[in-house]
Structure formats: C-alpha cells, structure tokens
Amino acid sequence: MDTSLPVNRRAFLTALAAAATAHSLRAQDRALVTKTPPKIKLGMDNFAVRAMGWKAAQLLDYAATLKVDVLLISDLEAYESLEDAPLREVKKKADDLGIEVYAGSWSICPTSTRFKKNWGTAEEHVRLGLRVAKTLGSPVFRVVLGAGEDRKTEGGIKARIADTVTVLKACRSQALDAGVKIAIENHAGDLHSWELAALIEEAGPDFVGANIDSGNAAWTLEDPMDVLETLGKYTICSSLRDDMIWETPDGASVQWTAAGEGLIDWKQFAARWSALCPATPIIIETISGFARNFPYKKPDFWQHYDQRPEAFAKFETLAKRGHAIPSFKAPEGVDRKKAEQDYQKGELERSIAYLRTKIGLGLKV
C-alpha cells in the first residue's frame, strides 16, 4: 500500500486552500480599489483674492501656482472683454495650464435688493452668462438670488424665489442648448438650504443646480454639514470656507475662517461630498476677518426666518463648541491695502494646503 498518498492529498488540499484564500484576498483588494472614492477636484474662487483686483489672465497665473484644478471666476467684470474671441484666449490659457474655468455672476432676481442692471434685464444677464460659460467651456454659470435683506422685502423670500424661478424658466432652452447648468448659491443669508432645494425643483433640476456655500450656511443658522445633506444631490458648483461660531448674550456670532481653522470636520465633509456629488469640485472662497452677530434670542428675530427646530439645534450645538476669535486688523505701520491683500492670499493658500495635504483633495500634487 502506498502510504505517501494521504500525505500528498493533504498537501494538495492545503495548497488548494491557500490558493483560494489568496484569490479571495485579491478579490477583496480589487473590491477595495473599486470602492475607493474618486479624487475630488480642488479649486479657488476669485472672490477669495478680491483685493488684488486681478483680471482673468492674472487669476489663472496665480491659480497655477496653487496647483488647483478649477478656477471659479465669479463675476463678469474679471474679463477684459466678453466678446467670444478674447474669451477663447482665456480658455486656451486655462487649457495650457491644466485648469478648468467655471463662470459666474451675481443676482438674477429682478426684485432683489442686490440686483444690478449692469447686464440688462435679469433674463439678458442669464443669457449673457450662459454664452460666456459655453465659450469658456464651463459646465456651470453660478448666480445668486440676493441676500438676507430680501427676506424682509414685500412678499418676503417666497416672492423673491418666485421671481427668480420665472427668470430661470425663461432661459431654460438657452441653458439646455448651451449645455450649461445654472448654479444658484445660498448667498449672504438669502436662502435656507430647503428653500434653495425647493427653488431648484420648481425651476427644473434638469438645468438648475446648487452652488453650495458653507459660510453662508451659518448665516441662515444652519450646520454646513446639514446643508450639504440637503443640497448635495443638486450641487454642481461650490464656494466653501470654514466657520467659527460662538455664543453671545443675545444669540451667536459667526466669523468665517480658512479651512481647518473653524468648526467643520473636513474629513467627514469630504466623505459625504464624495458620496453625494463626487464630480463637483470643492472650490474655496475664503472671506475672513470679521464677525456677524445673530440675535436670535430676541423675540422679533425669527419673523424673517423659517425656523426648523431640528436644523437650528445643530447650529446651536456648533455655537456651544466654538469660541470667539479676533477680527482682522492691519498691522501698525503697514499699508492697509497691502495688508489686506496679504491676508486674503494667506487665508486662501492655507486652506488649499490644508485640504490637499490633510484631507487628500485635488488631482494635482
């Protein structure tokens, strides 16, 4: 009898089991690779360095030094010309630098306190922006309704939303023809996140989306993370920064900060961003150096806000965690304009560095 057969059989079965285990591990590795979230593009908004007064070409040169993927030029005044030929030159420069340009402008609500007639009627403004965006290769045209003051106007914010929706619907065919979506920002306390979501649904999410602003989230007394959960599925552009919030005798104060220097958990924020709107860039718009108090403990405060206790409770939790920080003040003996320029660049550059090195954002190294 061949007594070596059981030994060989055991060896064979052992080897087979090892191979199966190795194959299983490789399959798990492949699954992990498959499930690894895509890298999120990292960008800057030109408003972050507004004190520089740069035009598009200078903004692109600066953006290249930061190695960002996207430059949001959020106002039409930043171009030397809005004619197609000069805009194509801007696009060529951006392409050569490996930077995507996103186009934007300001209020398109004709009854907003922030609306200006620089670009004609609200509809003419939108159509101009769509043409600019298409020429630049921008997938979006970022706009705003207005500001918190609009909540106090006749008819309140609901009337301003209705007026904005009317403008958007009048421009639907042009947006679809251009292949450009209109991104509405929650801007300067004008819209709660749920109000912006309702505006988008009413106008038509096939051509309208959200430009989420984490700083302005705090100006409607919301947690930026909560705002992302509400608007994430609509988000096609962004203007982000951090928030420091702290309690005051009559409510809470909000001061915007560089990313990583406030209360936002950016690892968690980026993880949810990756799940909700992974193709949308995280664009930094630092606006820092001053605080605004919200006296929500006064009885007449809430008449202009849509109070939702569960949402407000999350804001209050942030206020309890935060602490007062000083406002920006130009150093003694330093030219104020130069100090402001240096301050703005510092806030933006620290934010980009933090999000790239600590959070892993951006396609470039």
Language-model features, listed with the residues they occupy:
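Active-site beta-loop-alpha junctions enriched in small/polar residues
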Residues: 47-49, 76-78, 106-109, 146-148, ...
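Hydrophobic faces of well-ordered beta-strands that scaffold small-molecule active sites
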Residues: 40-45, 71-73, 101-105, 141-143, ...
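Active-site mouth loops of central-metabolism enzymes
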Residues: 43-55, 111-123
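Catalytic domains of carbohydrate-active enzymes, especially glycoside hydrolases
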Residues: 58-76, 137
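Active-site acidic/histidine proton-transfer and metal-coordination neighborhood
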Residues: 16-22, 34-37, 60, 93-100, ...
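Glycine-rich, proline-tolerant flexible connector loops at the mouths of alpha/beta enzymes
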Residues: 72-91, 148-152
